[in-house]
Regions:
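Alpha-helical and His/Cys-centered functional microenvironments
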Residues: 11, 21-24, 78, 202, ...
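Acidic, glycine-enriched active-site microenvironments
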Residues: 266
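Metal/cofactor- and membrane transport-associated sequence elements
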Residues: 33-217, 223, 227-263
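A generic alpha-helix propensity feature with a strong bias for hydrophobic helices
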Residues: 5-10, 22, 56, 175
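Short, Lys/Arg-enriched N-terminal segments with co-localized hydrophobic residues
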Residues: 7-8, 14-32
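Conserved small/polar residues in nucleotide/adenosyl-binding loops
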Residues: 269-276
Length: 276
């Protein structure tokens, strides 16, 4: 095959120069990051994702059969809403430097979020992976919240509420605690989201439940499928290891202690539930 020498040199230069530059940039980032920690957090992120379908099944088995599909889809569809809200603005106002109350807009629409590390946020793992791990936390917080309105709220209004809640409630609280906000400056340490995830979703669920109300015609009923609830509980159990252990962001002594403590806590709870 013959090529015009001039054009061939130019095309060869253009073809080879760009990949080489890109490869060199990637290699520099690989050297800076810790590959063991990156793989570790990647696996933990996948485990935490399992918690959302797990809670969906858990709640779906506890409600009446006529409301099972709506209950399951409330948690699963929320994944889509949370993903859009988090990637567009939630991550930025949570972890970008701003003031004591809100983060800035540097990461708006995932701008400046990629394979590279961040010296202030994720010094040894890709910033994009850190963003995804935190997004899983936001997603599970919404799933926990959905349990308070099972069989009480319509599907579309709930999804609208989720989008607003992520931007107006969860993200600011995440910035207060994890993003250098006023709670962080008090010296507070929130390992694995005791405040950001559980208190925020719990209080929000309580307020939402009170506002909606149980209803006068609400009657007690037995769960329609405890097998589905059991399967969901197992998925949540499995995902909780990634949730707690991954919060160390590195495979070290803290991660192993979290792993052991989570195993013990789950076994003690299971034993207590079996006695009842």
């Amino acid at each position: 095959m013959s090529l015009n020498l001039t054009h061939g040199v130019i095309l060869s230069y253009r073809f080879l120069h760009f990949p080489q530059t890109l490869i060199m940039m990637l290699l520099k980032e690989v050297v800076r990051m810790n590959m063991d920690d990156t793989i570790f957090l990647f696996l933990c992120t996948l485990l935490v994702w399992l918690m959302t379908p797990g809670l969906s099944l858990f709640y779906g088995g506890l409600v009446q059969s006529k409301n099972a599909l709506n209950t399951v889809m409330q948690s699963m569809a929320a994944i889509v809403i949370v993903t859009f809200a988090w990637m567009i603005i939630g991550f930025s106002i949570s972890f970008d430097q701003g003031n004591d109350w809100l983060g800035g807009l540097k990461f708006l629409g995932l701008n400046h979020v990629g394979f590279a590390i961040s010296k202030t946020i994720s010094p040894h793992i890709p910033l994009a992976l850190f963003m995804l791990f935190q997004m899983m936390f936001c997603t599970i917080a919404v799933s926990i919240l959905s349990g308070s309105i099972a069989e009480k709220m319509r599907f579309i209004p709930y999804l609208i509420f989720v989008g607003l809640w992520v931007v107006l409630i969860y993200s600011p609280v995440a910035h207060w605690v994890w993003g250098g906000g006023w709670i962080s400056k008090l010296g507070a340490i929130d390992y694995a989201g005791g405040t950001v995830v559980h208190i925020t979703s719990g209080v929000s669920g309580l307020i939402l439940g009170i506002m909606i109300g149980v209803g006068k015609k609400q009657e007690k009923h037995t769960p329609h499928n405890l097998l589905i609830t059991l399967i969901g509980g197992i998925l949540v159990w499995l995902g909780w290891y990634g949730f707690n252990v991954g919060s160390a962001f590195t495979f070290d002594q803290i991660a192993m202690i979290s792993f052991v403590n989570t195993v013990i806590a789950c076994l003690l709870y299971t034993s207590d539930a079996a006695d009842e």
